[in-house]
A protein has these predicted regions:
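Hinge/cleft segment of the Venus flytrap/periplasmic-binding protein
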Residues: 35-55, 194, 205, 301, ...
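Extracytoplasmic "Venus flytrap"
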Residues: 36-75, 79, 83, 90-103, ...
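Hydrophobic alpha-helical segments within soluble ligand-binding/sensing domains
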Residues: 41-44, 101, 157-183, 197, ...
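Periplasmic-binding protein-like
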Residues: 59, 108, 112-121, 139-143, ...
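Short beta-strand elements in bilobed, periplasmic/extracellular small-molecule ligand-binding domains
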Residues: 82-94, 184-185, 206-226, 268
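Hydrophobic alpha-helical
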Residues: 118-135, 202, 222-283
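Flexible loop/hinge segments that line or gate small-molecule binding clefts
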Residues: 128-165, 280-283
Length: 369
């Protein structure tokens, strides 16, 4: 699944390689103000990396037609505004079409991009086009997903979300607060590499905690779609009867699971997740107001990873230094046991991500697009 694809079709569902998920996760309270996001490190100051060479910056999205992608683009524009020598910003949206994604990369190179940031929704299928852009002298930085290519050969750097840290924090939370019970991980398309990697990490992290028991050594297939997640939940209830924790990597999946338990007249289990959305968080806040909330923890901040990608690209192109790592961690956006409520904005789109560094005014502009 790519972070926040629009219609969640299989061809579009390439999850970060994420993710989303995301070297040190901080467990501090998140301020409600974007410019004070206390739980999330901002990273290095790009102004030390701007250099002096005039720069044409480009972003290529494999699938850009949703609020998450628009938010990430706004995060990049905000970061780029700190370097006055970034003279132009080019953007291309392949709308879920692999052939167009490849041609977009070629086109952005032809238009004079010096730095090309790429969200590789199609994974290694776009690697030949990415390599060609690198060989043409463009500084190429794929972000979110970890590709199989090599820096200096296929691209200049790959800035990606640290999935290992996410699994570790989930398990720490479950051990600290749930303590014992049955678990299942609900994820995407059958056989996809991201979900398999997360599942392997979960099993490894859970090994020291026998009281936390995975009911299956395979993830539950949902195709990253709400309706499929609800159907899968009905099957889980029929097979296992009881579940204490469900683990998710996409907000719409969590919504389907919640609906599945509610339709069955059952208590919603605890949820440890990443990549929630405004709808899920508003549903949880409404349940809390009624005294019906379930234990909930989610890791966020994925829209800001593009800022790290831009900084790395700028440092390479300008010959300056970027001290930040290539693996970027998410942070705790909500923790019902830690007293951290998620942000809910009824005026924002259902699929909005409110966990980044944009001000409310900047987010409002994004939502009006």
């Amino acid at each position: 699944m790519s972070y926040r694809t629009g219609s969640c079709s299989r061809s579009q569902m390439r999850f970060l390689g994420i993710a989303a998920i995301a070297a040190a996760l901080t467990w501090t309270t998140v301020s409600p103000n974007a410019d004070e996001a206390a739980g999330m490190p901002r990273g290095a100051d790009i102004r030390t990396m701007c250099g002096t060479k005039p720069t044409v910056l480009a972003l290529a999205d494999g699938f850009g037609g949703n609020t998450w992608r628009k938010t990430a683009l706004a995060e990049m524009k905000d970061e780029a505004s700190k370097c006055p020598n970034i003279k132009r910003l080019l953007y291309a949206d392949a709308a879920g079409d692999l052939a167009k994604a490849n041609s977009d990369i070629n086109s952005l190179v032809a238009q004079g991009a010096n730095i090309l940031i790429i969200y590789p929704d199609f994974g290694d299928a776009t690697l030949p086009a990415i390599r060609a852009a690198h060989e043409a002298g463009v500084v190429v930085v794929p972000y979110i997903s970890q590709l199989s290519g090599n820096a200096g050969v296929d691209f200049d750097a790959n800035v990606y979300a640290n999935v290992n840290a996410g699994a570790k924090k989930w398990v720490e939370w479950m051990n600290n607060y749930i303590k014992e019970g049955t678990l299942l991980y609900f994820s995407g398309v059958a056989g996809n590499g991201f979900s398999t990697t997360v599942m392997d990490n979960l099993k490894r992290e859970l090994a020291p905690y026998p009281k936390l028991k995975l009911l299956s050594d395979q993830f539950i297939v949902t195709n990253w779609a709400t309706a499929d997640a609800e159907k899968a939940t009905a099957g889980v209830i029929a097979k296992y009867g009881k579940l204490d924790v469900f683990i998710t990597d996409f907000g719409p999946v969590a919504l389907g699971i919640i609906k599945g338990f509610q339709q069955a007249g059952l208590k919603v289990p605890a949820n440890a997740g990443v990549a929630s959305n405004n709808e899920l968080n508003c549903v949880w806040m409404e349940a809390k107001a009624k005294g019906q909330a379930w234990p909930y923890m989610t890791l966020e901040g994925t829209t800001t990873i593009v800022r790290y990608a831009l900084r790395r690209g700028m440092a390479i192109y300008q010959g300056t230094q970027d001290p930040d790592p290539l693996q970027i961690d998410t942070y705790v956006f909500a923790d019902s046991f830690g007293g951290i409520d998620p942000k809910c904005d009824k005026s924002a789109p259902l699929d909005a991500d409110l966990s980044g560094f944009l001000t409310p005014e900047q987010l409002s502009s994004v939502f009006k697009q």
